[in-house]
C-alpha cells in the first residue's frame, strides 16, 4: 500500500485529501481544498492562495489516476464544488475534471441537516451531469481484487447533536496493511469513531483531531486518542482541525507522551510527506507582518 498526503493544515490549507494505492485500486480520499475566508480578522495571505492552487493542481493530477474518489461529508474542504471559487481554487469546470467518469463513494443525505443536504443536492446533480457513478457509502463494503474498502456507519462531525452535521469514515484493507481514514470527528470526541477503529485495527490511522483553536473538550479527545494508540497502529496521523493552532503539540502533549511509551509514532500529513509543517492559517497574522500584502477579500456565494 502506498500513501501520499495531498492537502491538509500541516501542508498549508484546509483539507484532508489523501491518495492511497494498492495492487488493485487507486483511491483519492476527499478531493477538496479550501481556505478560511477570515482568521484573526484577516483574509487569506497570498501565500495561502498560492498553496491552495498548488494543492488543487495535485488533486487534479491524482484524480486522473484514481479509480475511486470519496466524499466523507459536505463541507467545502472535503469535496470539489461545481462553481468557481478563489478560496477553493476552482473554476466552473474543475469538478468535471475531478469526478468525471469516476466511482464516487459519498455520504448518504438521509441524516444530514438542511445545509449539508442542500450541498449534497448540488454536488450529486453536478456529479451526475459529469458522468460519475454515485454510491452512498454509509456502512458499505466493496472488494476490488484483494483489496477491501469499508465505510463506517454515519458518525457525528464532532459532539453528538453538532450543527456541523455527520460524516462517514473509511478503511482500506490490503493484506497485512490496514488504513483507516476518519475525517472531522474532532477528537474523536465521541466513542463511535473509536469503535470503528477498533473494528478495523489499522496499521495506519488518519484521524481528524480536536479543534485546538476553539474551546473544546481536549481531555475527551485525548482519552479517545489513547484508545486508538492502544490498538497499536504503526502510525497515528493527527490531522485537520487540530493543526489550526500553532501550539497544538503542547495542547496534545499527554497524547505524545502516551504514544511514545507504547512505541506508536504520532505523525502529520507533512511528516508523512517528508517535509516541514507549514501552518499557514495558524500563522496568518504573522505572515502579514513578515510579508506585507494587500488584504484582498473575495465575495463568494455558494451556487
Swiss-Prot record:
It holds the Pfam family Lactamase_B_3. InterPro entries: RibonucZ/Hydroxyglut_hydro, UPF0173_UPF0282_UlaG_hydrolase, UPF0282_hydrls. One of its GO terms (molecular function) is hydrolase activity. Belongs to the UPF0282 family. This is UPF0282 protein PAE3680. It comes from Pyrobaculum aerophilum (strain ATCC 51768 / DSM 7523 / JCM 9630 / CIP 104966 / NBRC 100827 / IM2).
